[in-house]
From Swiss-Prot:
Cofactor: Mn(2+)
Gene Ontology BP terms: DNA damage response; DNA strand resection involved in replication fork processing; double-strand break repair via homologous recombination; double-strand break repair via nonhomologous end joining; meiotic DNA double-strand break formation; metaphase chromosome alignment; mitochondrial double-strand break repair via homologous recombination; mitotic G2 DNA damage checkpoint signaling
Record's subcellular location: Nucleus; Chromosome; Chromosome, Telomere
Name the UniProt record assigns to this protein: Double-strand break repair protein MRE11
Region described as Disordered: spans on this chain: 510-711
Bias-annotated ranges (Acidic residues): 639-650
Organism listed in the record: Xenopus laevis (African clawed frog)
CDD domains: MPP_Mre11_N (cd00840)
GO cellular component: chromosome, telomeric region; Mre11 complex; replication fork; site of double-strand break
Length: 711
């Protein structure tokens, strides 16, 4: 750090190191790339320590997996303890009501104010879509770090109906920062909440113009669909700087939004998690200086990040070299690709920084468009030539081509070519739920869903794939089936198949138009799955437990007995008799399976098993034959849980009246809900570009009026 910049770091200047999308644990089992995320995180923490920043600000996705491995958690805790604990004094204070900012924690205060901890580097972080709160208690990996006193987790939304973003108010000398944060929320849901004006950013009542308003968000910034992103215009115009996480391309130099008149900085990821063009940009973190309403962002290149080079090769652009009719054209293409890869390896060797901690094997990706009658060659044989020279030998070459859409009246026509090429060209990620939606949009009428909804199926598939909720699909089907049965019963429809099908179709179309009701259905179904999982026993039942259960069970026939028996009722499938019991005597005991007393009431297990296999037509049979359907409908589940990522559940939190009383208890922490008005030139933050990373700079020099022109 230059002497001129050091002289400007006085007692009124905040110094903040900004980073996002660290993705700890990415490819941790890979022999070559397994430590890349940990090495980059170590460098980020070391930069924060060396630059003596006031705190480290993370924009989400600290972990790559929702349930990080034991090794990943251990390394993360080691690094945080190494760099964040010490005797260096903290020179800023928190003015806001911390019980509101961190109210969802058992320790609702910043870690450096804990008398039992000695923190020298505070870390503030929101959660991302990879490490978002899930499960029965709506916990995430950041909550573990928060309970350990190493990270201050803020910006967590606790309601799916209305979001009030309360800032963490910080002061250093005469400089004051209102730090807003919003952890990852499904983009479609958050988009809808912004449109319905259900997102409110609270502001300090006193001296609104004296606060530097800094907002950390983790959402799609680029448009992936009509509502699958958050437009910058949705954000309040009183903001001065927005730190945008989730997008991996490094665009850390703040850019001005001419409509809202704030600046947006996109730090990008510190590790390449996909071989896309956006990840090939040089990785940086930012050293943000804030003094009063002025700011400066200094780009700091990361020197331990693995090099990544990507190129496109369109074979049809070389008609003089490649002729599809040539029998040896495939060998010529392979030779040409080898030359391209060798050239990229030479470039990587020249650009290597000489840092001993930087990985020596670069990532190489050559995307080959073989549209025009060409054939791909054997990529496995090709990869063997670069096993010892690249970090990703198995996927150096990626073949793709643009398929023509064929119009056939009697076939399902899905443009998979468009689906395949879009992620390659735009660096986007293909999602399973999008494939489900795309399939049913173009599928024939005879294979369309008649009872379930595409949106519900997509959400359940997402939970199954991303969150390992194995019962999500089953519970969704059961829930929507039960709801349809109740609807038909209330309508008193005759038990005729044609009429039932017509009513089911109308009911399904009605539910599709009511997105809020459908979201509630999905949340209820996933809540059932999580409640069922949280209540499932972790150990196998003993013989005594099994006998006690059998004494309570009463069924009418052997089929119901077999359906109601738990799958894990006995260890390793052994019969109730002793290990040495003769096979001729097994099952002949007076307390054998299925011989429970007939005059005892039926158990819940039997009811559930019977109701599970009931069809819609069965629901219209005489009530005396199906007593279990009502029991299933009466079963209640806890509704105290929320999952911010999957739009599936709700969380009970501190009542709004209590929160309001906390907010008004102190004049220094009171907030205003009034709508924000356009600010004058004097109250907005000033930004000064830093054209050269290596040059000395004055972050607080005066700017001309044209730099921050107002309306």
């Amino acid at each position: 750090m230059s002497s001129s910049s050091s002289s400007l770091d006085d007692e009124d200047t905040f110094k903040i190191l900004v980073a996002t999308d660290i993705h700890l644990g990415f490819m941790e089992k890979d022999a070559v790339r397994g430590n890349d995320s940990f090495v980059a995180f170590d460098e980020i923490l070391r930069l924060a320590q060396d630059n003596e920043v006031d705190f480290l600000l993370l924009g989400g996705d600290l972990f790559h997996d929702n349930k990080p491995s034991r090794r990943t958690l251990h390394i993360c805790l080691e690094q945080l303890r190494k760099y964040c604990m010490g005797d260096r004094p903290i020179e800023f204070e928190v003015l806001s009501d911390q019980s509101v900012n961190f109210g969802y924690s058992k320790f609702p205060w910043v870690n450096y104010q804990d008398n039992n901890l000695n923190i020298s580097l505070p870390v503030f972080s929101v959660h991302g879509n990879h490490d978002d709160p899930t499960g029965a208690d709506a916990l995430c990996a950041l909550d573990i770090l928060s309970s350990a006193g190493l990270v201050n987790h803020f910006g967590r939304a606790t309601s799916v109906e209305k979001i009030d973003i309360s800032p963490v108010l910080l002061q250093k000398g005469h400089s004051k920062i209102a730090l807003y944060g919003l952890g990852s929320i499904p983009d479609e849901r958050l988009y809808r909440m912004f449109v319905n004006k259900q997102v409110m950013m609270l502001r300090p009542r006193e001296d609104e113009s004296s606060w530097f308003n800094l907002f950390v968000i983790h959402q799609n910034r680029s448009k992936h669909g009509p509502t699958n992103y958050i437009p910058e215009q949705f954000l309040d115009e009183f903001l001065d700087l927005v730190i945008w996480g989730h997008e991996h391309e490094c665009k850390i130099a703040p850019t001005r939004n001419e409509q809202q008149l704030f600046y947006v900085s996109q730090p990008g990821s510190s590790v390449a998690t996909s071989l896309s063009p956006g990840e090939a940009e040089k990785k940086h973190v930012g050293l943000l200086r804030i003094k009063g309403k002025k700011m400066n962002m200094q780009k700091i290149p990361l020197q331990t990040v693995r090099q990544f080079f990507i190129e496109d090769l369109v074979l049809s652009d070389y008609p003089d070299i490649f002729n599809p009719d040539n029998p040896r054209v495939t060998q010529e293409i392979e030779t040409f690709c080898i030359e391209k890869v060798e050239a990229m390896l030479d470039t990587a060797e020249r650009e290597r920084l000489g840092n001993p901690r930087q990985p020596d094997k670069p990532l190489i990706r050559l995307r080959v468009d073989y549209t025009g009658g060409f054939e791909p060659f054997n990529t496995l044989r090709f990869s063997q030539k670069f096993v010892d020279r690249t970090a990703n030998p198995k996927d150096i070459i990626h073949f793709f081509r643009h398929k023509e859409q064929k119009d056939k009246k009697d076939s399902i026509t899905i443009n998979f070519g468009k689906i395949d090429s879009k992620p390659l060209l735009e660096g986007t990620t293909l999602r399973v739920e999008d494939l489900v939606k795309e399939y049913f949009k173009t599928a024939e009428k005879n294979v369309q869903l008649s009872l379930l909804t595409e949106r519900g199926m997509g959400e359940a598939v997402q939970e199954f794939v991303d969150k390992e909720e194995k019962d999500a699909l089953e519970e969704l089907v059961k829930f929507q089936l039960e709801k349809t049965q109740r609807f038909l019963k209330e309508r008193h429809i005759d038990a005729e198949e044609e009429k039932i099908d017509e009513e089911v179709r109308k009911f399904r179309e009605t539910r599709k138009t009511n997105t809020n009701e459908e979201d509630e259905e999905v949340r209820e179904a996933i809540q059932r799955a999580r409640t069922h999982r949280s209540q499932a026993p972790d150990v196998e039942m003993s013989d005594e437990d099994d006998d006690a259960l059998l004494r309570k069970v009463s069924l009418s026939d052997d089929e119901d007995v077999r359906a109601s028996m738990p799958a894990r009722g006995r260890g390793r499938g052994r019969a109730r008799g002793g290990r040495g019991q003769s096979t001729t005597t097994r099952g002949t005991s007076r307390r054998g399976r299925g011989s429970a007393s007939a005059d005892q009431p039926s158990s819940g297990r039997a009811t559930k098993a019977t109701g599970k296999n009931m069809s819609i037509l069965d629901a219209f049979k005489p009530s005396s034959r199906q007593p279990t359907a009502r029991n299933v409908a009466k079963k209640t589940y806890s509704e105290d849980i929320e999952d911010d990522d999957s739009d599936l559940e709700e969380v009970s939190f501190t009542p709004s009246s209590v929160i309001e009383s906390r907010r008004t208890s102190s004049t220094s922490t009171s907030y205003s809900r009034k709508s924000t008005q356009p600010q004058s030139q004097a109250t907005k933050a000033h930004f000064f570009d830093d054209d050269d990373d290596e040059e000395d700079f004055d972050p607080f020099k005066k700017s001309g009026p044209s730099r921050r022109g107002r309306r």
